[in-house]
């Protein structure tokens, strides 16, 4: 175990809410108070809107929005019980116009201080937790699940925050974002601490790093999975995307974790390790690294076993129910992060053995004679990795249903179609979450790439366009025969399809099961 192993905090079980005075909060964030004759006013909660303001003594954080300034909603938050307002000078002008005379705390940029302010209101809870953050383009959710289960097997009480939701010691807690806004996040840390949680595993998105959602959080370990094209609607270039992730690792960054582990299987990982300076490295492709995976064996079911060479421990055996070389990388990274957090690697590895992640290489089995999988892959590199993995598990043909999300990075649409057609025998282009865009426009971009990939592929490829996602799934399953493999890619664990501002219930897993049963019943009747 490393000499600089983080401490394991003593669980706190008090139910008394934390509090900070308005004057203390102003001094902490460097703000200026107005209309505040009583600087000893106690603040117990902080929120960005009325729905997140708790009943006891909250302060409303009014930030500029894409359409309106948050201060325009001051009447709503006042009705919710907000005793004071944290805002900028534009917000103060709006409050004056509305005749709002509550105490106000003025700063130049609310988002810049919101993380520290929220942490202060809830008593800096992350410092009483061993906090492990996972970032990267793909693999965050799977790595986080592996960490959660491994830590639980090692005897710790664990919190999880990520794409598929939040859990406190295994119990679900509703959240909306991969990385919640700073007030919600700090309150979650506070709740976890109250419930005796010792370790928290958290997915950290590039948006969260860029927008300051994790400011004020003390991370013991940061883990980097990989980087590939995504979010170029938010980050203008891959370099900007990389720089956002690097905030978590770069020496001198206020967001940098105490310890870092970086997978160097791709060039971006190698660069990230260089940026971090003192990061420990992970490799599964034969590169020299601190943690290396080897002796990989794969069963017909996709179950994998391998060893990880761990500094000061030697080789640790690992078994995974999850298929794919990328999951060997995810598991090795999870193990490395756990070791950096002072966890016994052997006990941790036992916990990873039976991890299943909703919508990630999730097999759907209704007794059919071909392999059917649902996966969240919605980025070019992820789609390619999933198809490459499935190709190794089947003797027959490979088919995929693929689409792309609206109001998101449009430059990845054609590459997703192209990479699919280079690997699959059948590509069905369909709708994902069109959001406010015209679905046919999105499909056209994916189709362009698919046709190009089919023309350049070293095998015959059929490309179809079926806009209705349920119909596309049925067509894929009707096409599949004995020994084939199919994957419905893009939505994974999601249970809704967002079209023109309306979310319709839609679960790829349900649709695949229904189509499989329907196809089998038709076959039995023949």
From Swiss-Prot:
Gene3D superfamilies: Mur ligase, C-terminal domain, Mur-like, catalytic domain, MurE/MurF, N-terminal domain
Documented EC number(s): 6.3.2.13
Subcellular location: Cytoplasm
Catalyzed reactions per annotation: UDP-N-acetyl-alpha-D-muramoyl-L-alanyl-D-glutamate + meso-2,6-diaminopimelate + ATP = UDP-N-acetyl-alpha-D-muramoyl-L-alanyl-gamma-D-glutamyl-meso-2,6-diaminopimelate + ADP + phosphate + H(+)
MF (Gene Ontology): ATP binding; magnesium ion binding; UDP-N-acetylmuramoylalanyl-D-glutamate-2,6-diaminopimelate ligase activity
Binding residues for UDP-N-acetyl-alpha-D-muramoyl-L-alanyl-D-glutamate: 48, 50, 178-179, 205, 213
Pfam families per the UniProt record, alphabetical: Mur_ligase, Mur_ligase_C, Mur_ligase_M
Domain of life according to the entry: Bacteria
Family annotation (NCBIfam families): murE, PRK00139.1-2, PRK00139.1-4
Protein family: Belongs to the MurCDEF family. MurE subfamily.
This protein's name: UDP-N-acetylmuramoyl-L-alanyl-D-glutamate--2,6-diaminopimelate ligase
Protein's organism: Corynebacterium efficiens (strain DSM 44549 / YS-314 / AJ 12310 / JCM 11189 / NBRC 100395)
